[in-house]
């Protein structure tokens, strides 16, 4: 309770999440000594610590400056939809969240305080579900300020902890070599959990560990070397290959993940070899598959290293015109506001730090929209300007708009300036156009 109060005082919406999780866990997995008196003490301690922050928040949300005269959901759609709205969530990110949540639930099954962790995970899922629905039902500032969709970050924090504990127990336990190998694979896969394929390996390996350690009939089957061989050949190695394919598709494949995937395959095959020797059986034919996979990984790395270095060099080359632009503006005598290209939160964000890089004020940019969260009255200025600038069709329209609004300079994604302006600076991609009187 004290920690929840401190967290609330530092970051109120995270404090609200924590209170919801602890309350849900208290109801569903009540500690043996947690009677009514202990519960009241905890509530009182939280209220005492969080009261100053709660009073300040209440004051800011009920004052004249807090009145919202616009649709909050439309503001979010204009500013930063994928931070608040389920409609902007990417399918592969949703899939990763669901898979890692499942893996955490299975890992909790292998721990001593299973019910408590299941309650915490259930509370997180319920909060995320509320974050999916509430913005479309209640168009109010507090709903968005709670950032309920961001509770997935708590799951991303809790899930690896539970999985690590369960995997380490499997690795250091008294189980068969195959289960120990699954623990090692699970830990290595966890280092790839942010990649598209990583959660698949985590979920698969932790599920097999749970079946081996908790399921009676399943344990008997997993102890069979023939079953282990089939699992490696038909499930685990194809899952590793899928991770390689997904990394290649996302241009994230280099020597480190290749080494990691190869080690996973080697650990699995090594466990089968150890088990075969223990049982005095022939070596598993899957060793050939492992060697082939390792060779493919190494060949792919060799083919990708040059391409990766070329990609990095190309990114630096593409960034160079912007760097030259802001360096020139920073050292130039030009003063006053700049009209700059608008960034897209889903695409390019090259100009989001222009005012800091160039040390000059801007007429409007995408990043300014964040200020509406703290000062709703700013919406009337920012949204109007943002929509107006976004609607400008070409460079000539931008120059005309700048003249109509007494904007001194315009940065264009062009090497020349339209009539009505003079070019103060230009490079391979950008021009600084000064509005003529």
Language model features: what each stretch is:
Residues 24-25, 29, 165-172, 272, ...:
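Membrane-water interface at transmembrane helix exits
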Residues 12-18, 27-160, 164-167, 191-212, ...:
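Transmembrane catalytic cores of multi-pass membrane glycosyltransferases
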Residues 127, 137, 152, 178-350:
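Transmembrane helical bundles and short interhelical boundary loops of multi-pass, membrane-embedded
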Residues 303-307, 314-387, 399-417:
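Short periplasmic/luminal acceptor-recognition loop of GT-C membrane glycosyltransferases, typified by
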Residues 417-436:
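Short acidic, glycine/proline-enriched helix-loop-strand junctions
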Residues 163-185, 370-386:
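Short linear, low-complexity motifs centered on an aromatic residue
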């Amino acid at each position: 309770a004290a920690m929840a109060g401190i967290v609330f005082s530092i970051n109120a919406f995270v404090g609200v999440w924590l209170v919801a999780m602890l309350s849900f866990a208290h109801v569903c997995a009540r500690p043996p000594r947690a009677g009514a008196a202990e519960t009241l003490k905890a509530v009182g301690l939280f209220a005492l610590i969080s009261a100053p922050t709660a009073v300040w928040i209440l004051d800011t949300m009920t004052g004249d400056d807090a009145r919202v005269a616009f649709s909050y959901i439309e503001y979010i759609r204009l500013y930063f939809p994928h931070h608040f709205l389920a409609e902007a969530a990417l399918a592969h990110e949703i899939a990763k969240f669901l898979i890692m949540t499942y893996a955490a639930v299975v890992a909790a099954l292998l721990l001593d305080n299973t019910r408590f962790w299941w309650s915490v995970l259930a509370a997180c899922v319920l909060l995320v579900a509320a974050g999916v629905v509430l913005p479309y039902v209640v168009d109010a500032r507090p709903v968005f300020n709670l950032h309920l969709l961001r509770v997935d970050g708590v799951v991303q924090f809790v899930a690896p902890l539970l999985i690590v504990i369960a995997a380490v127990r499997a690795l250091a336990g008294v189980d068969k070599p195959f289960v120990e190998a699954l623990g090692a694979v699970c830990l290595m896969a966890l280092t790839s959990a942010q990649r598209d394929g990583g959660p698949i390996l985590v979920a698969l390996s932790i599920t097999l560990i749970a079946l081996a350690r908790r399921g009676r009939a399943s344990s008997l089957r997993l102890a069979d070397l023939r079953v282990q061989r089939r699992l490696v050949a038909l499930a685990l190695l194809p899952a590793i290959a899928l991770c390689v394919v997904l990394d290649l598709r996302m241009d994230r494949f280099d020597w480190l993940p290749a080494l990691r995937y190869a080690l996973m395959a080697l650990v699995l095959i090594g466990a089968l070899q150890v088990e075969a020797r223990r049982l005095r059986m022939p070596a598993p034919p899957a060793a050939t598959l492992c060697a082939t996979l390792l060779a493919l990984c190494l060949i792919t790395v060799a083919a990708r290293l040059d391409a990766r270095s070329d990609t990095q060099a190309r990114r630096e080359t593409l960034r160079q015109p912007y760097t030259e632009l802001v360096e020139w503006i920073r050292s130039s005598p030009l003063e006053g506001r700049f009209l700059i290209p608008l960034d897209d939160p889903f695409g390019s964000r090259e100009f989001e730090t222009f005012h800091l890089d160039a040390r000059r004020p801007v007429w409007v940019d995408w990043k300014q929209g964040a200020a509406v969260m703290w000062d709703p009255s700013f919406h009337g200025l920012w949204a109007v300007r943002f929509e107006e600038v976004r609607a400008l069709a070409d460079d000539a329209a931008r120059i005309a708009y700048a003249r109509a609004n007494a904007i001194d300079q315009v940065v264009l994604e062009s090497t020349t300036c339209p009539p009505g302006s003079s070019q103060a600076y230009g490079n391979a991609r950008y021009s600084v156009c000064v509005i003529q009187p």
